[in-house]
Amino acid sequence: MIRAGIIGATGYTGLELVRLLKNHPEAKITYLSSRTYAGKKLEEIFPSTLENSILSEFDPEKVSKNCDVLFTALPAGASYDLVRELKGVKIIDLGADFRFDDPGVYREWYGKELSGYENIKRVYGLPELHREEIKNAQVVGNPGCYPTSVILALAPALKHNLVDPETILVDAKSGVSGAGRKEKVDYLFSEVNESLRPYNVAKHRHVPEMEQELGKISGKKVNVVFTPHLVPMTRGILSTIYVKTDKSLEEIHEAYLEFYKNEPFVHVLPMGIYPSTKWCYGSNHVFIGMQMEERTNTLILMSAIDNLVKGASGQAVQNMNIMFGLDETKGLEFTPIYP
């Protein structure tokens, strides 16, 4: 049985980890940490968790003694120093601190210096692309929600040189849970309801993460123009991607079917069928659709994920499974909630 701990257990991704791990047949929760609610039982704060473990302040000695794996569900910049204190525990960080190959890129976009970063062996935790590296990883940087939806939608096309990587346009829409549980006027019901708005235009922190991984896949420099939008729903991301091509839709579709034929969570839809966030709600599944705009030789790719599951906690559990030699679908086999 894998002994699992969670730091940041009372945020949305932390709570989702609790839900998934409580139902995992090969894992048990042995440590929960929260600065805000330390000393209280989790179910006192969130009755829906049915989890009576007492939340505590972060204690590296307790983690090392009681955990085989630690999930850090903290904002960017909060995990790095904590993780460096731990010995003998596998780390899966749901923040951005271990996603980048170049610490200079992290410094540029996140405004923090990561001392000694080059000495930490880490793997970017997108199983569909880095499964073999994840198997032997000690530290995994779990991908961001938007990058997960965009990278999986583009990977086959870039891998097989089916599209032009120089200018990739991404229009993405996310449910409000993607912003976390922080108190902010912008996320009040009366501000979000019956409204749709872009945010962090031309400066979203997930852009360099996308460009890093897409560049590895294509072997060329990749430029991503990314505009995210906040939509009045709780969960889900729908990314619509525009990229130039001189190939036929049939050829591209066949390449996607072949690329993902053995992937349990990625589903390439029949031509003419387009994904909906409703289809992956509460699950680790990804749905990808496509269409060709023949007048302009533009391939339009569409992907739908649940931002809290495949976009965060579900993918983290998938990584845990791989790191401990389990079937990666273990504890994640459930179908989406519908309607």
Swiss-Prot record:
Known catalytic reactions: N-acetyl-L-glutamate 5-semialdehyde + phosphate + NADP(+) = N-acetyl-L-glutamyl 5-phosphate + NADPH + H(+)
A matching Pfam family: Semialdhyde_dhC_1
Principal location: cytoplasm
Pathway(s) served: Amino-acid biosynthesis; L-arginine biosynthesis; N(2)-acetyl-L-ornithine from L-glutamate: step 3/4
GO terms for cellular component: cytoplasm
A biological-process GO annotation: L-arginine biosynthetic process
Gene3D superfamilies for the chain: Dihydrodipicolinate Reductase, domain 2, NAD(P)-binding Rossmann-like Domain
Enzyme class, first EC level, given as a word: oxidoreductase
InterPro entries (UniProt xref): AGPR_AS (IPR023013), AGPR_type-1 (IPR000706), NAD(P)-bd_dom_sf (IPR036291), NAGSA_dehydrogenase (IPR050085), Semialdehyde_DH_NAD-bd (IPR000534)
CDD domains: AGPR_1_C, AGPR_1_N
Keywords, ordered alphabetically: Amino-acid biosynthesis, Arginine biosynthesis, Cytoplasm, NADP, Oxidoreductase
Active site residues per record: C145
EC number(s) per entry: 1.2.1.38
Protein location: Cytoplasm
SMART domains: Semialdhyde_dh
Keyword NADP: yes
An annotated Gene Ontology molecular function: N-acetyl-gamma-glutamyl-phosphate reductase activity
Family stated for the protein in its record: Belongs to the NAGSA dehydrogenase family. Type 1 subfamily.
Role, per record: Catalyzes the NADPH-dependent reduction of N-acetyl-5-glutamyl phosphate to yield N-acetyl-L-glutamate 5-semialdehyde.
Protein name from the UniProt record: N-acetyl-gamma-glutamyl-phosphate reductase
Organism encoding this protein: Thermotoga maritima (strain ATCC 43589 / DSM 3109 / JCM 10099 / NBRC 100826 / MSB8)
